[in-house]
């Protein structure tokens, strides 16, 4: 069963597999020396993520190093913004800066609908190259940011600690925010479809900042727009597995399960055994391993992987971290994570 | 029933009250103009929190402005550190800097046992003045940081994003970390007893960073040391209510309930109705209101308070935010929070 499909895709589709697939969020990046070397030559993040040769090369770095079961596009959740008329820059160690933060109706009404094949053709190019070259030895993953998280960026104008600007908008001018969220949902849905057509076999939606919402606000500003994105994708690609990740999601995992996604990617702040009970059995689970464990040693890493795996044996499970791998992680510890992960068996 | 006791203390003791008491975490601070003015004259945070006249004056600012049901000592969770031989400075907008971060056994073995009446007499002075002057029109609260959170500060050396240094110690040299946590638990227990003897009628333990631990690590590095602090306090003051707060606690609230505390202070990322089901009925609940709601308007603030209160009617409940009030919060919105909170009735 599923012998013709790569392991991660098979598992995500619910087919019987011999071991859980393994990949890492943010598996290409700063913790790899080869990436830091390339960054010296190409210091602009936007160039690295928007020049198709560079994005392709970086996407493949962890594949060459560790042979993970998933190869994810090297890109950023903000990459589609310029195609909607929102310009941004990423300043090393400071994060993204939105050129002209979105604060009023006029700005929202002037946003362009995203035409991915026009403004994001470099992404299509990278995904089709990855699909061809990875050649089903791994599964190619695409990804997007969810509407709430994109809205938080463009309203705040930068990485925020307190989200006071977008919350002010949410509580004072909810109609304005809903217009923005709706625009993003449609555009992001189109963008995911474009990624799938270009080669992505599994896609992940990051609503990184939805964990900053109370569950009552999640039901108004995050959940419905996650669902809208999923509905747009599933209407055309019902068979493509969709993963949803939220950082700080322990209070809303039941809600995540109701958005039409196939797999919930858990952070590490919830016991995966309890999460399995709270999430309907048809929905798969990914992640949950504290990325901080990779600052330990081989023994602690292996033990944590085993503990996590043992709690998920009767579930569809994809081994992953509970958050992106952290800068400063020793590469040999990432190696251990992949090596040990591949030794697991059902 | 409880007529002689202030409202918050009565409610915390489980006595029948006519309305939930209301106070705010970090209710004295940057959002108040009177505090910012004082800060101009006394720019050193350590001076403001360690000079008993200033600490007293600041503690009383919100009492004069809003008449909350609780008056909490103006201090910092790091304040006891110098009494253990760990020096620190707080740099405005950058947070605390530990002079000589704790990284090895020798440093841990050289830590002094805290003698609060010697090194923290200014805290005793402030609490006894507050107790006298507040005169049971409100309840006087003391507080401490829990061992894990203090350890995270002194090992990382500053506010951390990823906690890679303390996690490295936890996973590679757990014995070392346990020694440090044990030292803090004993000292912090003594410090709380000193606060109670000096005038604190209710005390709150902040394990602000325990939400960064997976539940499995929480059970090793956070929970047992919270419990140890509580045991030390309860041995001498079984009647003093103890509140426990953790930021990002949605995945561990059942565990918090097992530490011997009386009241769990919830952040806003969990539905309080679900939390009430997960927490044994004998344990009280505090908080849960998103501090971001105070960037909304009067109507949204009142509605949120009502929604929260309505979900807790059969529980011991203390109205509070789910986190400290945020810098930049309009003072009139804090006013609305207190005013509306005091209009609730059982």
Swiss-Prot record, chains A, B:
A Pfam family reported for this protein in Swiss-Prot or TrEMBL: URO-D
Binding site for substrate: 26-30, 76, 153, 208, 323
Alphabetic keyword roster: Cytoplasm, Decarboxylase, Lyase, Porphyrin biosynthesis
Compartment annotation: Cytoplasm
Site feature Transition state stabilizer, where: 76
EC numbers: 4.1.1.37
GO molecular function annotation: uroporphyrinogen decarboxylase activity
Keyword Cytoplasm annotated: yes
PROSITE patterns to which the protein is assigned, alphabetical: UROD_1 (PS00906), UROD_2 (PS00907)
GO terms (BP aspect): protoporphyrinogen IX biosynthetic process
Recorded catalytic activity of this chain's protein: uroporphyrinogen III + 4 H(+) = coproporphyrinogen III + 4 CO2
Pathway(s) the chain acts in: Porphyrin-containing compound metabolism; protoporphyrin-IX biosynthesis; coproporphyrinogen-III from 5-aminolevulinate: step 4/4
CC annotations in GO: cytoplasm
Main location: cytoplasm
Alphabetical list of HAMAP family matching this protein: URO_D
Protein family according to the UniProt entry: Belongs to the uroporphyrinogen decarboxylase family.
Subunit annotation: Homodimer.
Job of this protein: Catalyzes the decarboxylation of four acetate groups of uroporphyrinogen-III to yield coproporphyrinogen-III.
Full protein name: Uroporphyrinogen decarboxylase
Source species: Prochlorococcus marinus (strain MIT 9215)
